[in-house]
């Protein structure tokens, strides 16, 4: 029980911080944190909640299938399946899914992936070589959630990672809440920088193709 309260507090603090950045517009987004490994349980945001508010109903505890462990009227977030795929296939401890203007714009510039390179902040992703290059996959935003989940699952390759969904934000996961938040901040910085650079250069260039 102590672990549950500790993780609840941790997830609540992350929600507050990301809310101050307006990364949960119009009740969008969802975040989760692992509570136990065997059996697998995790806390996830309840569906349709105003994330600028803090209430006792912000999160609910679900199992490895995303089904509530305790009787509740709350519904887990619509994209819970993405979280279950991550936790069932990795040792990740935290998953963050947010909608920002920048990450949505990026998915309209590129088709299957965006490639970013030679930025110091890439080291926040535990990539240390000089002039490092990263590739972030982009998948289609299928309305059929099982199809979305299956396409997403194909890109889960480790205990940390990120996947962009076209016009539907980014999902980032990490070893724990600190790692996941650090990675999310790094990706959002890279997207903002890339878009600003393209605007200064006079438009889409360097391999980017308008996908809208």
Swiss-Prot record:
Pathway: Amino-acid biosynthesis; L-methionine biosynthesis via salvage pathway; L-methionine from S-methyl-5-thio-alpha-D-ribose 1-phosphate: step 2/6. Catalyzes the dehydration of methylthioribulose-1-phosphate (MTRu-1-P) into 2,3-diketo-5-methylthiopentyl-1-phosphate (DK-MTP-1-P). Belongs to the aldolase class II family. MtnB subfamily. Keywords: Amino-acid biosynthesis, Lyase, Metal-binding, Methionine biosynthesis, Zinc. One of its GO terms (cellular component) is cytoplasm. It catalyses: 5-(methylsulfanyl)-D-ribulose 1-phosphate = 5-methylsulfanyl-2,3-dioxopentyl phosphate + H2O. Coiled coil: none annotated. Gene3D superfamilies: Class II aldolase/adducin N-terminal domain. Its EC number is 4.2.1.109. Zn(2+) binds at residues 97, 99. One of its GO terms (biological process) is L-methionine salvage from methylthioadenosine. HAMAP family: Salvage_MtnB (MF_01677). GO terms for molecular function: methylthioribulose 1-phosphate dehydratase activity; zinc ion binding. It is an enzyme of class 4 (lyase). Its cofactor is Zn(2+). Homotetramer. This is Methylthioribulose-1-phosphate dehydratase. SMART domains: Aldolase_II. Binds 1 zinc ion per subunit. It comes from Bacillus anthracis. It holds the Pfam family Aldolase_II.
């Amino acid at each position: 029980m102590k672990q549950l309260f500790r993780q609840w507090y941790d997830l609540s603090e992350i929600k507050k911080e990301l809310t101050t950045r307006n990364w949960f517009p119009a009740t969008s987004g969802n975040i989760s944190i692992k509570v136990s490994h065997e059996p697998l349980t995790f806390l996830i945001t309840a569906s349709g909640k105003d994330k600028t508010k803090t209430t006792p109903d912000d999160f609910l505890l679900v199992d490895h299938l995303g089904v509530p462990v305790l009787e509740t009227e709350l519904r887990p977030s619509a994209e819970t399946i993405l979280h279950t795929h991550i936790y069932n296939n990795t040792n990740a401890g935290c998953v963050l899914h947010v909608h920002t203007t920048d990450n949505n714009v990026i998915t309209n510039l590129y088709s299957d992936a965006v490639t970013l390179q030679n930025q110091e902040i890439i080291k926040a992703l535990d990539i240390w070589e000089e002039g490092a290059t990263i590739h972030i996959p982009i998948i289609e935003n299928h309305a059929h959630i099982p199809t979305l989940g299956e396409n997403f699952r194909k890109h889960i390759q480790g205990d940390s990672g990120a996947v962009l969904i076209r016009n539907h934000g980014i999902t980032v996961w990490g070893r724990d809440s600190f790692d996941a938040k650090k990675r999310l901040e790094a990706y959002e910085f890279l997207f903002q920088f890339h878009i600003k650079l393209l605007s200064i250069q006079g438009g889409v260039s360097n391999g980017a193709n308008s996908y809208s």
